[in-house]
């Protein structure tokens, strides 16, 4: 690992552990590290994976609601972090989407780790895109996961030729 990256991650961990707020999830650690990396390096492309929503698999609805509230707060803070960075001003696009929907599983056997896939709703997912390069509105056509990748490539200036996915041109400026 590059020395500067190691130093940034170490500083983020230290602030996370010793900070004035008591962190209550690994997603908060993810946010703190992300905040430091954005502040220090302003990467052109970054993937942030908040994972605590998987608490839903435990079957405790109150924990799931807490995770949703936390996710809303951290996502808002992430957007604020992006907006405060002069390197991203009027340039950054932030797509927000769940980790995945589900592909069809003919067995419909309640799947691996309770990821049911026999239900059509398991194949639906949403995406929110904020910032430069996107416009307000909704996409009414059926969209596949590969379309999200094609859209990201278009935002990065690549045509994505040869890809199965089709960019969501209706949301792109």
Briefly describe each language-model feature range.
Residues 116-156:
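Substrate-binding rim/cap in mid-to-C-terminal beta-strand-loop elements of soluble/periplasmic
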Residues 41-46, 87-93, 132-133:
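Loop/turn elements at helix/coil->beta-strand transitions in domains of secreted/extracellular proteins
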Residues 45-49, 93-96, 126-129, 151:
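Structural recognition of the beta-strand scaffold that forms the well-ordered cores
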Residues 1-37, 168-170:
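Active-site-proximal alpha/beta segments of enzymes that process anionic O-linked groups
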């Amino acid at each position: 690992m590059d020395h500067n990256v190691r130093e940034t991650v170490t500083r983020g961990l230290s602030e996370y552990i010793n900070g004035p707020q008591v962190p209550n999830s690994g997603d908060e650690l993810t946010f703190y590290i992300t905040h430091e990396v954005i502040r220090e390096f302003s990467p052109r492309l970054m993937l942030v994976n908040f994972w605590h929503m998987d608490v839903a698999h435990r079957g405790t609805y109150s924990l799931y609601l807490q995770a949703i509230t936390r996710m809303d707060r951290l996502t808002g803070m992430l957007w604020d972090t992006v907006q405060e960075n002069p390197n991203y001003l009027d340039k950054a696009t932030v797509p927000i989407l769940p980790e995945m929907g589900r592909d069809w599983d003919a067995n419909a056997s309640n799947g691996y780790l309770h990821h049911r896939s026999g239900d059509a709703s398991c194949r639906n997912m949403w995406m929110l895109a904020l910032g430069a390069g996107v416009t307000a509105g909704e996409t009414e056509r059926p969209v596949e996961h590969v379309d999200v990748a094609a859209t990201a490539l278009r935002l990065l200036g690549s045509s994505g030729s040869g890809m199965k996915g089709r960019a969501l041109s209706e949301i792109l400026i």
